Amino acid sequence: MTLFFLTCLLAVFPVVSMKSPIFGPPEIDSVEGTSTSIKCYYPPTSVNRHSRKYWCRQGPKGQCITLISSNGYVSKDYEGRANLTNFPESGTFVVNVDHLIQGDSGSYKCGVGINNRGLSFDVRLRVVPGSGVLNGTQVYAEDLGGKVSISCPFTSANLPNVKSVCKQIADKHCVRVIDSAGYKEPSYEGRAKLIIQGTTQTEFFFIIDQLQVEDDGKYVCQAGDDSSGDKSNVDLHVLKPEPELVYADLGSSVRFDCALGPEVVNVAKFLCQKNKEKTCNLVANTLGQRNQTFKGRILSQNNNGVFSVDITNLRKEDAGLYLCGANSDGQPQKSRPIQAWQLFVNEETTFPSRPSVVKGVVGGSVAVLCPYNPKEVNSVKSWCRWEDTQNGGCPLLVQSTGLVKNQYEQYNGRLVLYDEPGNGTYTVILNQLTAQDAGFYWCLTNGDIHWRSTVELKIVEGQPNLKVPKTVNVELGETVQLTCHSPCKFYSYKKFWCKWTDQGCSALPSQDEGSGQAVVNCDQNSQLINLTLKQVTKGDEGWYWCGVKEGLQYKETVAVYVAVKEKGTGSGALSSVRAAPAEDVIETSVRKVDRKVVQDPRLFVDTQAKDPEDAAGGSIASADPGSSAGQGGSSKVVVSTLVPLALVLALGVLVVGVLRARHRKNVDRISIRSYRTDISMSDFENSRDFGANDNMGASPVSQETTLGGKDEFIATTENTVETEEPKKAKRSSKEEADMAYTAFLLQANNMAANIQDGPSKA
């Protein structure tokens, strides 16, 4: 059962073999008697550099027989004509074989370690005879894209007869290609012809221009159509050019330099990639056309007849054969001259990974991490914007030396490059984003081109996380505090302020680092980062950035412009200015009001119901301690009100004490829970209608109040389910005491009102 289950799994999920990181030439065509050189690449790890390198030939049973290895072994077939050299610093080894014979044709492997263990690459070697006559057959060996002129002899008896050439196919059937009567096979149209020189010559020539791979094969020249016709056999070998090997890591960059010679210096050049259908898809040409598959990842230039193409952010599908040629319309065709490259993309890469897309919001910022070769610490780092135009290009925006001058107007206060020597990366920060900033950007250095990279910036909907005022105006000599608000998710991040210039953004010292003209401090509770500029001068004018970092990696930034103005005459108001986001100021003030208890004497004095106009007018004005009327009569009102009220309260306390002592034995034990609240005397009016509650506004379920800036919450619960109809309550001594206390409060309230009316009427 288990075996059946595993079989089903293998049927649904086929085994995926890991691609070998060893790379070499897939095909080699050579002529007999010449020599060949096979170059193989391997990942330059410490283990691979010291491991055995070998060149072996595959046998009919799948075994690979070693011919030569780096351990010093050389087979009998290779003695005296082969050698193997290892280049560990570049991760390559080269096998040279001299005095090639046709018997050397076959399938081989170049590898690292032990034969048949997977760390190898398959190579096919074809050795063809040189041009000449071999066993009565004329042999021609010409390069792909070249030209061949085949001589076809015949006897004088066939001078008046038709001359023709046919090509043999697999079943030994000969298909006519061309004849002297005017016929020409379509695939040879425009590039093949017959030349018959005079009427006395016993030889005609079959000429093929722009040789193609399909032209390789056996031909028959014939003069006359019957059995008496003259025939001659021809063997044509079209030699494929050995492509230049290009070994690159996944995510890195490559460059193809196409130099086809002075004869086509003014002809349009093209670069194409061979696909599985054996057609060549255009990558780019000198006419400005580019394949959309490489959008944002390709740069090309044509200088002095050399067509250079850079491809960055390499993908697995970028591997393959690339051809460069010349054609008037810039489209790929089988032409000569031609250059070829075989690109291998190593998926077991040590190249630093990074996002190919970064997203930002309007008004926000992005931080792009760019890799460079750690061995080139002193190289000039740059950042450019890729242009999707016919001429293409990538104009520089910023370098490690500062902002590019012709970009100052568009990127003033917005762009900076942080060079971080030693860790192999540099950071580019762009803030105050707009929708027009979307596009592709390239990370460049003037060193190793393989470390170039590109990133796509997308603008999405959203709001910036950091908030500052856009502009702050301050007068000379004043002190200004810039406030930057950050969300709680940045709580553990390092916050900073810096002053932007076209040379970079210089960090300002923190409060712990010493006092100076600019001091930074951060209030973690309110998530505010404050920058204080003391005694502002004209030199303080400019852009200031607030930002956050996670470790050594920059995250988000926001910019504010400080404008310094001359001191106004007679202004003399504030000696310091505080600039903060408006919404933060509102939230802070509201929070403070909510927690503040306003003690208004009016609550304890004037509590009788009044006309709305009087309540909105005179009473509020008189209660304002800041008004002149309130200050003028405050002392008289206090004396005339508080003294009689104190006497009445003392008398009331005495009466209540006597009554309670008198009925103490009959009074039930009462547990009183105290609470604090603000009470006005009007709360005691009609107290009997409310069950003599001391606080009419209090909820029967819960009571909450704020006093002295602290919150106290008291919750009380009662049983709302009536289980038995209550009997008519018998009035107890406790109730009599409560009624007496209520009557006293009502009387005190009336006395206080009469006393207040007296001074007001006076």
Curated annotation (Swiss-Prot):
<dbReference type="GO" id="GO:0005576">
    <property type="term" value="C:extracellular region"/>
</dbReference>
<dbReference type="InterPro" id="IPR050671">
    <property type="entry name" value="CD300_family_receptors"/>
</dbReference>
<keyword id="KW-0964">Secreted</keyword>
<feature type="disulfide bond">
    <location>
        <begin position="484"/>
        <end position="546"/>
    </location>
</feature>
<feature type="disulfide bond">
    <location>
        <begin position="258"/>
        <end position="324"/>
    </location>
</feature>
<feature type="domain" description="Ig-like V-type 2">
    <location>
        <begin position="145"/>
        <end position="238"/>
    </location>
</feature>
<feature type="glycosylation site" description="N-linked (GlcNAc...) asparagine">
    <location>
        <position position="530"/>
    </location>
</feature>
<feature type="glycosylation site" description="N-linked (GlcNAc...) asparagine">
    <location>
        <position position="83"/>
    </location>
</feature>
<feature type="domain" description="Ig-like V-type 1; required for binding to polymeric IgA and IgM">
    <location>
        <begin position="19"/>
        <end position="120"/>
    </location>
</feature>
<dbReference type="InterPro" id="IPR013783">
    <property type="entry name" value="Ig-like_fold"/>
</dbReference>
<feature type="region of interest" description="Disordered">
    <location>
        <begin position="604"/>
        <end position="634"/>
    </location>
</feature>
<feature type="signal peptide">
    <location>
        <begin position="1"/>
        <end position="18"/>
    </location>
</feature>
<feature type="disulfide bond">
    <location>
        <begin position="56"/>
        <end position="64"/>
    </location>
</feature>
<keyword id="KW-0393">Immunoglobulin domain</keyword>
<dbReference type="InterPro" id="IPR007110">
    <property type="entry name" value="Ig-like_dom"/>
</dbReference>
<keyword id="KW-0325">Glycoprotein</keyword>
<dbReference type="InterPro" id="IPR003599">
    <property type="entry name" value="Ig_sub"/>
</dbReference>
<feature type="glycosylation site" description="N-linked (GlcNAc...) asparagine">
    <location>
        <position position="291"/>
    </location>
</feature>
<feature type="disulfide bond">
    <location>
        <begin position="152"/>
        <end position="221"/>
    </location>
</feature>
<keyword id="KW-0732">Signal</keyword>
<feature type="domain" description="Ig-like V-type 3">
    <location>
        <begin position="251"/>
        <end position="351"/>
    </location>
</feature>
<keyword id="KW-1015">Disulfide bond</keyword>
<keyword id="KW-0813">Transport</keyword>
<feature type="disulfide bond">
    <location>
        <begin position="40"/>
        <end position="110"/>
    </location>
</feature>
<dbReference type="InterPro" id="IPR036179">
    <property type="entry name" value="Ig-like_dom_sf"/>
</dbReference>
<dbReference type="GO" id="GO:0004888">
    <property type="term" value="F:transmembrane signaling receptor activity"/>
</dbReference>
<feature type="topological domain" description="Cytoplasmic">
    <location>
        <begin position="660"/>
        <end position="762"/>
    </location>
</feature>
<keyword id="KW-1133">Transmembrane helix</keyword>
<feature type="domain" description="Ig-like V-type 4">
    <location>
        <begin position="363"/>
        <end position="460"/>
    </location>
</feature>
<keyword id="KW-0812">Transmembrane</keyword>
<comment type="subunit">
    <text>Interacts (mainly via CDR1-like domain) with dimeric IgA. Interacts (mainly via CDR2-like domain) with pentameric IgM.</text>
</comment>
<feature type="disulfide bond">
    <location>
        <begin position="272"/>
        <end position="280"/>
    </location>
</feature>
<dbReference type="InterPro" id="IPR013106">
    <property type="entry name" value="Ig_V-set"/>
</dbReference>
<dbReference type="GO" id="GO:0005886">
    <property type="term" value="C:plasma membrane"/>
</dbReference>
<feature type="glycosylation site" description="N-linked (GlcNAc...) asparagine">
    <location>
        <position position="135"/>
    </location>
</feature>
<feature type="disulfide bond">
    <location>
        <begin position="370"/>
        <end position="443"/>
    </location>
</feature>
<feature type="disulfide bond">
    <location>
        <begin position="498"/>
        <end position="505"/>
    </location>
</feature>
<feature type="topological domain" description="Extracellular">
    <location>
        <begin position="19"/>
        <end position="636"/>
    </location>
</feature>
<feature type="domain" description="Ig-like V-type 5">
    <location>
        <begin position="464"/>
        <end position="563"/>
    </location>
</feature>
<keyword id="KW-0472">Membrane</keyword>
<keyword id="KW-1003">Cell membrane</keyword>
<dbReference type="Pfam" id="PF07686">
    <property type="entry name" value="V-set"/>
</dbReference>
